[in-house]
Amino acid sequence: MMEPEEYRERGREMVDYICQYLSTVRERRVTPDVQPGYLRAQLPESAPEDPDSWDSIFGDIERIIMPGVVHWQSPHMHAYYPALTSWPSLLGDMLADAINCLGFTWASSPACTELEMNVMDWLAKMLGLPEHFLHHHPSSQGGGVLQSTVSESTLIALLAARKNKILEMKTSEPDADESCLNARLVAYASDQAHSSVEKAGLISLVKMKFLPVDDNFSLRGEALQKAIEEDKQRGLVPVFVCATLGTTGVCAFDCLSELGPICAREGLWLHIDAAYAGTAFLCPEFRGFLKGIEYADSFTFNPSKWMMVHFDCTGFWVKDKYKLQQTFSVNPIYLRHANSGVATDFMHWQIPLSRRFRSVKLWFVIRSFGVKNLQAHVRHGTEMAKYFESLVRNDPSFEIPAKRHLGLVVFRLKGPNCLTENVLKEIAKAGRLFLIPATIQDKLIIRFTVTSQFTTRDDILRDWNLIRDAATLILSQHCTSQPSPRVGNLISQIRGARAWACGTSLQSVSGAGDDPVQARKIIKQPQRVGAGPMKRENGLHLETLLDPVDDCFSEEAPDATKHKLSSFLFSYLSVQTKKKTVRSLSCNSVPVSAQKPLPTEASVKNGGSSRVRIFSRFPEDMMMLKKSAFKKLIKFYSVPSFPECSSQCGLQLPCCPLQAMV
């Protein structure tokens, strides 16, 4: 058994380990390379009869636990909203866990209750919340409490709203059964609301309707008013609205200034879920999203996300604490005390009875950082997200389908959803960063959240390069396996194919003194302000042609083109007489030497399609190069990406030369 002196020694050892872990976490693989059940084989079938040594236990941290950990504190963890910690927070929980009080009533631990009340008032003022959410204000009958999660807070708010509405209905229908009254209740949220809102409706047996949002993914007053009127005509009783500030999918903000007056007029409980974005309201410049907050009956957010107070720690405020108490009050004799009814007993503000001393770590963090440093932390995360957004916008292969808010950027690879899905799969293989998908308007998107307080521009650039490399590989594979039939038509009509047939070398594209535009042209490029009209090529209006980057995204390309595309790329790489190092898909090798020369210019002029003539000169077995063989080819040999295209037109073509050159 461990004694105090050994605990002191082992405690130092553990603190050293934690410091080492958090200081070097960016060097670890973010996601583990394990399969479900990996731990079973590493543990004995039964618990030990005799105690293990601490050295054995401590050694198993790296041997057993860390190989299966997702490192949420890594700067390369971008999948979910943050779940940050900090040194003061860790110290706070160390003390709270040592005290280990269960502060269900004031009498069970006065410091637990009173510190929480004061810290929650601090936090409400820091966020700019209304005075009716304060414990200590002459005109307030509300206050704040720390819950375990926003999910639990939303359920508590819905249960309180349900109880209050049923009591109102009982005044006009005193003989009605409460279950019958409950069956008529209906609540509302946007279709972007968190899944916990749906779960709250299931638990409370209240119908939950998810309303459509506008083009900015925001729930507006018109949609809510229409739903209320329709439900009233059906005999339903509207009771509750959950407005989201910072949705999970795209960090959108519902319009409180429109929803609030409707809720006040119709007698609906307005609950605000600001789980992630709530921390941003520490900064005055982000409080525009709080316009209409005075109508809120309850408000919740997670300091355990972005405020560097580790899980669990959720702030929850109500305008009227008595509506909570009438919902959750049970008062057996063994929980009564001399100050019952005078002091605050938080057991009446929540579902469980027992509660942790969570306010210590929150108190430590606020005092250790101060408001100014917490604001600087939020601004830094937002600036890092802006930097990532700029990188995405400067790459024409990607698009940003929703406006960036705070530290979340959503983006996708242009084209069908399968491309974005495959990019995510490719990134997941290496585990060097962690991203997850979401969907908006049937489009698959990637969520990129700046999570760590230690994230730097170098971290962002490193992760962006990994994303772009994965996208380049996926686009190359897609163009190989599913070329668009329009690509071949364009190649046969535009004279750039003639340059290929004549054996144009890489050196003619990038050599000193050569004009890249003379060697090849882009099928279509973005039109700059003030730019002149596009040129005509072989009778074609180039501005009417589709962007080659978009043209390669056909999901229903004929199979007959696959072998020709593969063979052409193989031959193109094989005919270079003078080797030149180019950026490759998977290595820095150079193209292989030619086995046969390309046809001369004279032979090209003798009639027929130039594309057919090119392919006719190669051996039949080369023409039948399979998809699997081409994958091996691009694994071992360089495929040029011709980056100088971007310097001429601003369009970085991610695909093969077949799309890029004419």
From Swiss-Prot:
GO annotation, biological process: catecholamine biosynthetic process; histamine biosynthetic process; L-histidine catabolic process; L-histidine metabolic process
Catalysed reactions listed for this entry: L-histidine + H(+) = histamine + CO2
Top-tier EC class: lyase
UniProt-recorded Gene Ontology molecular function terms: histidine decarboxylase activity; pyridoxal phosphate binding
Modified residues (N6-(pyridoxal phosphate)lysine): K305
Pfam family, one: Pyridoxal_deC
GO annotation, cellular component aspect: cytoplasm; cytosol
Keywords per UniProt: Catecholamine biosynthesis, Decarboxylase, Lyase, Pyridoxal phosphate
InterPro entries linked: Aromatic_deC (IPR010977), PyrdxlP-dep_de-COase (IPR002129), PyrdxlP-dep_Trfase (IPR015424), PyrdxlP-dep_Trfase_major (IPR015421), PyrdxlP-dep_Trfase_small (IPR015422), Pyridoxal-P_BS (IPR021115)
EC number: 4.1.1.22
Binding site for substrate: Y81, H194
Pathway(s) it belongs to: Amine and polyamine biosynthesis; histamine biosynthesis; histamine from L-histidine: step 1/1
Cofactor: pyridoxal 5'-phosphate
Quaternary data: Homodimer.
Record function comment: Catalyzes the biosynthesis of histamine from histidine.
Family note: Belongs to the group II decarboxylase family.
Name of the featured protein: Histidine decarboxylase
Originating species: Homo sapiens
Gene that produces this protein: HDC
